[in-house]
UniProtKB/Swiss-Prot annotation:
This is Large ribosomal subunit protein bL12. The lineage of its organism: Bacteria, Pseudomonadati, Pseudomonadota, Alphaproteobacteria, Hyphomicrobiales. GO terms for molecular function: mRNA binding; structural constituent of ribosome. The gene is rplL. HAMAP family: Ribosomal_bL12. GO terms for cellular component: cytosolic large ribosomal subunit. Belongs to the bacterial ribosomal protein bL12 family. GO terms for biological process: translation. It holds the Pfam family Ribosomal_L12. Forms part of the ribosomal stalk which helps the ribosome interact with GTP-bound translation factors. Is thus essential for accurate translation. InterPro entries: Ribosomal_bL12 (IPR000206), Ribosomal_bL12_C (IPR013823), Ribosomal_bL12_C/ClpS-like (IPR014719), Ribosomal_bL12_oligo (IPR008932), Ribosomal_bL12_oligo_N_sf (IPR036235). It comes from the Bacteria.
């Protein structure tokens, strides 16, 4: 069980780009597809409560701004990406930086990246 807990912890610490790469590698290795099956919506699902407060946010880099070097440095610090990957992410904006983070963490990341000169959007 300790091995499984370690695997779960390691997977939880992956960045979005690393998780996508892992998914591709596993698809190739096992010969499967990670595409989600299309689900038919239930009749009662339209009446879902709309007043629920969002608890998980995606931090999306809209624009790298004029100070791209500073933004790249911040992206590297926040995501653990290498220089080339962080540069590609900043220059390929709009791109998600972090996904599924708490509101407090998303606001903190947004403030750091905006201080470096980036335009950020929380979704």
């Amino acid at each position: 069980m300790a091995d499984l807990a370690k695997i779960v912890e390691d997977l939880s610490n992956l960045t979005v780009l690393e998780a996508a790469e892992l998914s591709k590698l596993l698809e190739e290795k096992w010969g499967v597809s990670a595409a989600a099956p299309v689900a038919v919506a239930a009749v009662g699902s339209a009446a879902a409560p709309a007043a629920e407060e969002k608890t998980e946010f995606d931090v999306v880099l809209v624009d790298g701004g004029a100070q791209k070097i500073n933004v790249i440095k911040e992206v590297r610090a926040l995501t653990g990406l290498g220089l080339k990957e962080a540069k590609d992410l900043v220059e390929g904006a709009p791109k998600p930086i972090k996904e599924g983070v708490s509101k407090d963490e998303a606001e903190k990341i947004k403030a750091q990246l905006e201080a470096a000169g980036a335009k950020i959007e929380l979704k």
